[in-house]
Amino acid sequence: MKRILRDARTVIALLCTLLTADVFAQAMDVPFHAPSRIDEASLDIAIPDLANRVLGLQDQSKSRLDSGDLFWIEIAADKNTHAYTTIRNWRAEHGYSNGSSDGAAIVPLELYVDAQSRVAEKNITFDDAFRASFRSFFTDLDDKSAYRAMGWLGAPPLEAMRNQLADAVRRVRGTDRISVADAVDLCRRYALIETYQAIAPLTDALIGEDRANRYVIDDDALIKTPDGATINAIIVRPRVEAKLPTALQFTIYTYPWMLSSAIEAAAHGYVGVVGFTRGKRHSPDAVVPYERDGDDARALIEWISRQPWSDGRVGMYGASYNGFTQWAAVKHRPAALKTIVPYCPNDPGYGLPMTNNVFLTANYAWPFYVTNGKDLDEQLYSDNERWSTLGWKWYRSGRPYREIDQVDGLANPWLQRWIKHPAYDSYWQAMTANGDDYAKLDIPV
C-alpha cells in the first residue's frame, strides 16, 4: 500500500520518462574529469563545472539541447532564471499546464528555480522566496491539481540519492570525456539533490497551510459504537456549503499517509473519511482485527449519514484489508452504503491461517504487526530473518503447528484463536458477506 514516492530510483526514473534526449545529447562529448575524492564538496565543484561545459558546448554548436534536458543542466550550473524560463517553455511545448498530471513531477524544480530567481532579484532569503513561489503557484490550482502536484513535494531519501550520484560518477572515471547524455544524467541527479535538500525543510508547513485553506480537517474524530466501543477516524471536507457524498476507507493500517488518502477523496469532491479498526490509533479499546469490523463500519457509516455535511450517501473503496472491510460492511447492509469498490480484498478464513488444510506461515507475523499497539509494529514485522526461517525451525522441531509460537519464543494469541477454526465455520462467516448475503446485495459493486 505504500504509495508515496520515497525511493530515489523511482523519483529519478519517473522524472526521466518525461524527458527526451535529443540529437545533440546523443552525438557530442564533453570534457569531464571525475574527482578522485567523491564527496559533497568535490561534487559541488565538479558537477556545476560540467554543466557549464555542456552549456558552452551548446553555444558553439548549431544544435540545441531539448528543453527537457536543458533545464537540468541550467539548474546544475546555478543558472536558475534561465532554468525557470526553460521549464515554462517545456510546459508550453508539451501543453502541460500548471495543473496537468504530466507536468506535476517538475513542480518541485519549478518552485526551486523560481525561488532562487526571487532571491537574486529581491535580495531576500531562500526560505521567504520559496514560500512566495509556493503560494503563488498553488493559489490558482484547483483541488485535484494541487493534490497531484503536492504528491511530488515529499522528500525522497537524500542520502540514497547522493550515493547513487556518487556511483554514477564512479562509472565514468578513467576517461577525459563523457557523452552529453551521461553529462545530462549526472546533472539531473545533482539538480534533484540540490532541489530537495533546499525545499524539504519548508514543504510540510506550506502543504499544511494550503490544505487548511482548502479543507476542513478533523484528524482525530472519535465515534461511539452501539456496544460502547470507540473507533477513530480522519475526516476531510472541502470548504463548500453543499452537502456531499462520502468516500470511505475502513482499515487496520495506521499508515502516516492515511490523511493524504482522505485528502485525495476530498480533492475529487467527496468528504474523505478513513475509519480505523477498533483499538487502533486513538481508540482506547483493545485492538480487534476482523471480528468487529463489519459492525464498526456500519456504525461509522450510519454516523456519517447523520452529519450536517453529509448528503446521506457513502461509498467504500480500497484493497487488501480495506477491501475486506467493505464486504464486512455489506453483510450488515447499512442503508447509507450506496456502493463498494473493493479490489484484491482480504478474505479471512481463506488462506489465513490455512488453505485446504495446509497451514501457511506467510502471514504469521501479521497479528503482531497490527495488534502490538495503536500504530503498527514495523520493527518486529520487518525482522525478515526471523520470520523467513521460522517455518523451517518449526518443521525441524517436529512439534504440532499449534506450538509454532513456542518454537519462535513469542506467544501469538491471535494465531491460536484462528487455528481453533480450521474450517470456514460460523466464526469466519460472521465476519464478512457469504452465501445468501450475496443474494441480498442491492448496491453496485
Regions found by a protein language model. Give the residues of each.
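Accessory cap/linker subdomain of secreted extracellular hydrolases
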Residues: S145-Q197, L206-E209, K331-K440
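Alpha/beta-hydrolase fold nucleophile elbow
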Residues: P308-S320
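Glycine-rich nucleophile elbow surrounding the catalytic serine of serine-hydrolase chemistry
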Residues: G318-A328
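Catalytic His-Asp charge-relay segment
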Residues: D442-V445
